[in-house]
């Protein structure tokens, strides 16, 4: 773990030097974990050169046990911070902060404390670093995929007509926890959140919501308007299981489609077409292939197959992507969309989910967490992809 943490800090320091930023202060819990191995509350001061210092306000004793960093100090007051930054990085003319997640009130506080320094947004640097997973991270993600597979294997035990969606979901959630799923699923975007994921049946599958994805679901109330609801699952219903498993912090996103009985012919055809698009995107991903090229290809194929209106959603609720990066957060880089032009490169991990919605009834397609190994995309999630009749 020490080698991993040192490598991450070293890479960020290289980027700080390139932009002539003397120091960065990391405060967001996921970024703290990435650079220290601990989520304990505090400030990680990373100078462009030299040793990083983890200033911890709570829990100091736990942080000392969790992090391999040698410079870990107790922060009794915010007033210590400017002095510690000076000791760690010298005179700071440019100070890097995670402006994509930092509350405005805290930004003004840092601005006042470091009045002589220009504040620079280092969020893009951090997100791009985290986009490329190391072999250490890939192995953790593979273990998360095993949890996902075992959870999906258990679906036929729990999926019964007459049960409510939320009851079925709770059984899968209980199993996932006992297999090692940490429970919490972290997202970085403002006001984006998810609890395990989306399990919906019948007409609820195409019930849209604020969630930035092709599906939403009613949830239990408008207070949390996504995911499984109170609907009773009926014989003949198509059931979507789109759940995230998180092992040692790392997300795996996987979707499979189930049916209580025989799937309708229209769904079978749409599912085969969605799988075809899925496989063609995987084949097309080579070193240097742009995210935008993969996205444009998928949307073009869907339109040619007759799904232009219902690929990745309907109307204004349509998702503009076919995949999203996964790691310590569910919404990482790269995003497989026409607007992003990152080239495929070793270490990229993302959830690939070209889906076709059949309004009011069902959804076709799967979601796999995939890894670009330097030559091509390989699937990390391993569960069978056909519609599973129960």
What do the PLM-derived regions correspond to, one by one?
Residues 1-390:
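Active-site neighborhoods and metal-handling regions in enzymes and metal-associated proteins
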């Amino acid at each position: 773990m020490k080698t991993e943490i040192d490598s991450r800090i070293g890479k960020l320091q290289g980027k700080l030097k390139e932009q002539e930023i003397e120091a960065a202060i990391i405060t967001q819990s996921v970024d703290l974990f990435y650079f220290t191995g601990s989520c304990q509350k505090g400030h990680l001061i990373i100078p462009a050169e030299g040793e990083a210092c983890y200033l911890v306000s709570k829990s100091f004793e736990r942080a000392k046990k969790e992090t391999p960093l040698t410079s870990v100090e107790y922060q009794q007051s915010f007033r210590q911070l400017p002095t510690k930054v000076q000791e760690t990085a010298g005179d700071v003319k440019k100070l890097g902060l995670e402006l994509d997640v930092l509350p405005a009130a805290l930004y003004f506080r840092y601005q006042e404390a470091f009045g002589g320094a220009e504040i620079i947004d280092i969020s893009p640097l951090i997100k791009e670093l985290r986009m490329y997973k190391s072999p250490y991270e890939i192995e953790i993600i593979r273990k998360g995929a095993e949890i996902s597979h075992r959870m999906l294997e258990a679906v036929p035990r729990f999926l019964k007509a007459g049960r409510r969606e939320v009851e079925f979901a709770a059984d899968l959630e209980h199993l996932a926890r006992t297999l090692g799923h940490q429970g919490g699923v972290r997202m970085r975007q403002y006001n984006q959140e998810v609890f395990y994921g989306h399990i919906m049946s019948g007409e609820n599958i195409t019930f849209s919501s604020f969630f930035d994805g092709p599906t939403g679901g009613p949830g239990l109330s408008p207070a949390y308007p996504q995911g499984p609801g109170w609907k009773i699952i009926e014989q003949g219903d198509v059931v979507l299981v789109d759940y995230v498993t998180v092992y040692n912090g790392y997300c795996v996103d996987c979707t499979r489609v189930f049916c209580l009985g025989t799937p309708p012919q229209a769904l079978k055809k749409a599912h085969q077409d969605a799988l075809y698009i899925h496989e063609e995107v995987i084949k097309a991903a080579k070193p240097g292939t742009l995210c935008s090229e993969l996205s444009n290809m998928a949307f073009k194929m869907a339109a040619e197959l007759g799904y232009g209106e219902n690929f990745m959603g309907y109307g204004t609720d349509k998702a503009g992507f076919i995949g999203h990066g996964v790691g310590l957060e569910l919404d990482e880089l790269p995003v497989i969309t026409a607007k992003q032009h990152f080239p495929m490169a070793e270490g990229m991990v993302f959830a690939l989910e070209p889906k076709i919605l059949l309004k009011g009834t069902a959804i076709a397609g799967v979601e796999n967490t995939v890894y670009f190994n330097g030559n091509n995309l390989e699937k990390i999630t391993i569960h069978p992809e056909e519609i599973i009749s129960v």
